[in-house]
Design a protein with these regions (language model features):
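Alpha-helical transmembrane bundles and membrane-interface segments of multipass inner-membrane proteins
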Residues: 1-193
């Protein structure tokens, strides 16, 4: 750059604008739309958008690997986009009484503890390496299933029968895995890992 400023096309030898990153940015930009669709009582459309976001998550990862590896930007923004969508869905579905408020609070609290812990450790000068744990990956999978089923039920009137017990079981599984994954991250941080 002529002025000596950063080159926005490249960051530390890593491209900012790539097809996988554009897909991830589009998913992040879809979060406000998903919020509005739930608030405006259009859960069927929110369900379709949530599924599209899931497909885009798989596609951007596949493309990143196929195009020569994941970028640093993608490695940062992809989990942010995923978490932003999930947390927004939990809060919004609780706000419209499609999901228990206590569960949304638990999910948000766990994420706040993890982010707060990373910030505190960083301020204390401790190196922070963020590596997802198996229990955290399981928690995310359960959260995705719960949000998808909740949106599906609300959007397509799929109440009763097998759906209600599955939804109840998923609710408790998400609560348990949220607590377990939060505790695992706190334990790992306390041990210096």
């Amino acid at each position: 750059m002529p002025d000596g400023g950063p080159d926005l096309a490249r960051t530390s030898g890593d491209q900012l604008v790539t097809l996988p990153n554009l897909i991830t940015f589009a998913r992040l930009c879809a979060v406000p739309l998903a919020f509005w669709l739930v608030i405006d009582r259009r859960p069927g459309a929110a369900f379709a958008l949530f599924l599209a976001a899931g497909v885009s998550d798989a596609i951007d990862g596949w493309l990143a690997r196929r195009m020569g590896g994941a970028s640093q930007v993608g490695a940062l923004i992809d989990p942010v986009a995923d978490k932003a969508l999930l947390v927004t869905m939990f809060i919004t579905l609780a706000a419209v009484n499609e999901m228990p408020s206590w569960l949304a609070i638990l999910v948000v609290f766990r994420d706040a503890v993890i982010v707060g812990g990373v910030l505190v450790l960083g301020l204390l000068g401790r190196a922070v390496v963020i590596r997802p744990l198996f229990v955290s990956k399981a928690n995310t999978a359960l959260q995705i299933m719960l949000v998808a089923l909740t949106l599906f039920m609300a959007g397509y009137g799929a109440h009763g029968g097998w759906v209600t017990p599955v939804l109840d079981a998923l609710t408790w599984a998400v609560a348990a895995s949220t607590l377990a994954s939060g505790a695992a991250y706190v334990w790992r941080a306390a041990r210096g890992g």
